[in-house]
Amino acid sequence: SPGQVAFTVEEAVAAAEELGAPVMVKAQVHTGGRGKAGGVKFAADIDAVREHATNILGLDINGHLVKRVWIEKASNIAEEYYASFTLDRSAKKHLGMLSKEGGVEIETVAEENPDAIAKIWVDPVVGLDEATTRAWVAAANLPEAAVEGAVDILQKLYTAYTDGDCELVEINPLILTPEGKVHV
């Protein structure tokens, strides 16, 4: 979703005014569990943006101090998914995970319902091709209307993961709108 980084409450308010409410106010820190820690909030109006930005900026999330927030247009959400890439050191391959259990802690899903996560292992030398991505999306049971958008986003996520030499990239949630559009 289009959005803007804000380092102050005033910048958050200005971003929300430019984007138009409702918006999401999201802590930008290098750790998981932002939502659980109060670092992701829906703001229906500018007063709520001001309140949430005030509360989130300076918040400690897992030992990380929040110094900036991301303000983005809120979306109509029909379904939420989780998508990620990380390195599976034992397999010496990249591990992609895609699950309809988006918006929650993926560690809990992996523990309690491992079959809810569609996994692929990608050889770093070969990379992730479109056919493999389509099969992965099919294994995760995304609706037909979401396939094209999901394939595009997941291939871009893999490129960001490899080009950025990352240990982990994730989208949570990957959003499916009532109109069948997919976006982050």
Predicted regions span which residues?
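ATP-grasp fold ATP-binding core
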Residues: L19-R34, G63-A78, A83, Y158-Y161, ...
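Short beta-strand-to-turn element immediately C-terminal to the catalytic PLP-Schiff-base lysine
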Residues: A6, K41-D45, T86, M97-S99, ...
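Catalytic core of tubulin tyrosine ligase-like
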Residues: I46-N62, W136
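Solvent-exposed alpha-helical segments within well-ordered globular domains of core cellular machineries
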Residues: E10-E17, D47-T54, D152-Q155, T159
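Glycine-rich, mobile lid/loop segments that gate access to catalytic sites or pores
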Residues: W121-H183
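A conserved helix-loop-beta module that forms one wall/lid of the active-site cleft
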Residues: S1-A21, A27
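Glycine-rich phosphate-binding loop of ATP-grasp-fold ATP-dependent ligases
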Residues: S1-G3, V25-H52, Y82, I106, ...
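Hydrophobic alpha-helical hairpins/lids featuring a short glycine-rich hinge
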Residues: G63-W121
